């Protein structure tokens, strides 16, 4: 009898125990409601059959990705009371989740490897790890055995073949997700290229196996109408990079259930990238064209809810400049045969944070979400529209608001009307400024990489790294105010290296080594690295920089630096614009002395904090080159 660990896999060389020892049901005994099992590639067919044996769904639906199928899925969700039509817009819908299922759950998200050190660095004595959670194969096996047998009883298992990146691109990868959530089906159809063409492209090739269940088997008459299915007490999101697998249980929320997103496109892909010599990063990609017609592409890494989407869809305040969007969240990058770093956006949609999005902050996002959008946990207006904090739209007379909790709400109420991590899920093609090359199979050429975060004090508006190695250190030292996208509470300054802290698929020390190794790639033309901070405040707590469309002024300076312009001056932390080098024409008074000040006492403390963090969290796995950069920074700050 063949043993298996996860569905479709044999017992591995590491001795991992199987999920079940029972033989799989034959294809003939599976109740297939839509699609043809016999037409699936053998590997996919085996994965589906074994998973069905484990989870025991009522039936199987193989998704073809068609418009007719999508219409039927949305109708089913509406019938179940899980989504409501928003008649103010064309084909827009609102979902409200269980209040316990509203964000990524980092504490229940694990990487499974035989050796703990493959996943996380060895910590300095007694420290609590912040760079990922490891679970042993045996413990993971027990967790799976506890959760998955029979977990889909009474539900449909949907088979979702999907491509991360344009179908057929050499930079793309294929996954197959099995889920018992129709909400996931509707969302994945937006966020990925999904359906029959993906299976045709896959053939007998390799794919990432993704298994998801809301963790609520139906043994009676189904869910009560409108009850969001989830199992928060048993939630677990597991990644098995050696086997290229993802397993998720108990949550229907996007980051936990749309397995192509953070789970595949960052955690698993970062491990693929290390093994294959490329980069999978939490970065937006944008094209920027100056008034003379010169176009450049940049990638930028900010922690969640720090303005990636706003920057990726920016409407430049500088006359004659144009920004076009390739992607707002994830970049897969590889050097081509000419040594040029090229990037694709592996996603097909935007899964954006709604609160704070308005015609003033992101007019292109507002234009994008007027149709074919699935909103989650935003407020609803009585005239069939949506509402959230910062939407900046006056309500017509007599129009009332229902909060994300389904309760009456009015401006001035203590609780927010929309959850801080409420989302819009919308096809990328609807964005009015999508770059013409956003689906180019070869990717777009990246000339600069930008790191950034929310730093209310001490960190200047923009600075350039001295070189690649220094830039890698700058990425490793990133810190930012915490965001709503995870379950952390309150505003604390958190270390978030490369904006990847929750998304590393392997040991962060080895991730740093991988970034450093790019310097040794034959013929590689390394992008310049910059750091930005739109969020510095004055003593009264007011922002020193207007941000949003005015951020084009910083991109202008970056582009001029890429052209070789001598417009930077050296400081202990990097190269900042010379006085007058930043185009501030037409702006009301900006206090550049505060905006670019580098207080010695702040940076002495910053160095101590960075050293403490890297020593504690990365410890013996910290590359000597990164430690040398830290010591060099410390020496420069001491001489200020």
Swiss-Prot record:
Its keywords, alphabetically, are: Acetylation, Decarboxylase, Gluconeogenesis, GTP-binding, Lyase, Manganese, Metal-binding, Mitochondrion, Nucleotide-binding, Phosphoprotein, Transit peptide
Its EC number is: 4.1.1.32
Q: Main role?
A: Mitochondrial phosphoenolpyruvate carboxykinase that catalyzes the conversion of oxaloacetate (OAA) to phosphoenolpyruvate (PEP), the rate-limiting step in the metabolic pathway that produces glucose from lactate and other precursors derived from the citric acid cycle. Can play an active role in glyceroneogenesis and gluconeogenesis.
Which positions in this protein are listed as binding phosphoenolpyruvate? Answer: 104, 255, 421, 423
Q: Locate the residues binding Mn(2+).
A: 262, 282, 306, 329
- A single Pfam family it belongs to is PEPCK_N
Q: Which SUPFAM superfamilies match?
A: PEP carboxykinase N-terminal domain, PEP carboxykinase-like
Q: What else is known?
A: In eukaryotes there are two isozymes: a cytoplasmic one and a mitochondrial one.
Effect of inactivating the gene = Homozygous deficient mice are viable with no overt phenotype. However fasting plasma glucose are elevated from regular chow-fed deficient mice, indicative of defective glucose homeostasis. Deficient mice present abnormal nerve conduction studies and peripheral nerve pathology.
Name the coenzymes or cofactors required.
Mn(2+)
- Molecular functions (GO terms): GTP binding; manganese ion binding; phosphoenolpyruvate carboxykinase (GTP) activity
Q: Which HAMAP family match?
A: PEPCK_GTP (MF_00452)
Q: Which Gene3D superfamilies match?
A: 3.90.228.20, Phosphoenolpyruvate Carboxykinase, domain 1, Phosphoenolpyruvate Carboxykinase, domain 2
Explain how, and how many, cofactor molecules are bound. Answer: Binds 1 Mn(2+) ion per subunit.
Please list the residues that carry the modification N6-acetyllysine. Answer: 88
* NCBIfam families tied to this protein: PRK04210.1 (NF003253)
In chain numbering, the transit peptide falls at: 1-32
Q: State the top-level EC class.
A: lyase
The family assignment reads: Belongs to the phosphoenolpyruvate carboxykinase [GTP] family.
Residues holding GDP: 305-310, 355, 454, 534, 543, 548, 551
Pathway assignment: Carbohydrate biosynthesis; gluconeogenesis
| Reactions the enzyme catalyzes | oxaloacetate + GTP = phosphoenolpyruvate + GDP + CO2
**Where Phosphothreonine occurs, residue numbers?**
196
The name under which this protein is listed is: Phosphoenolpyruvate carboxykinase [GTP], mitochondrial
Which GO cellular component term is one of those annotated? mitochondrion
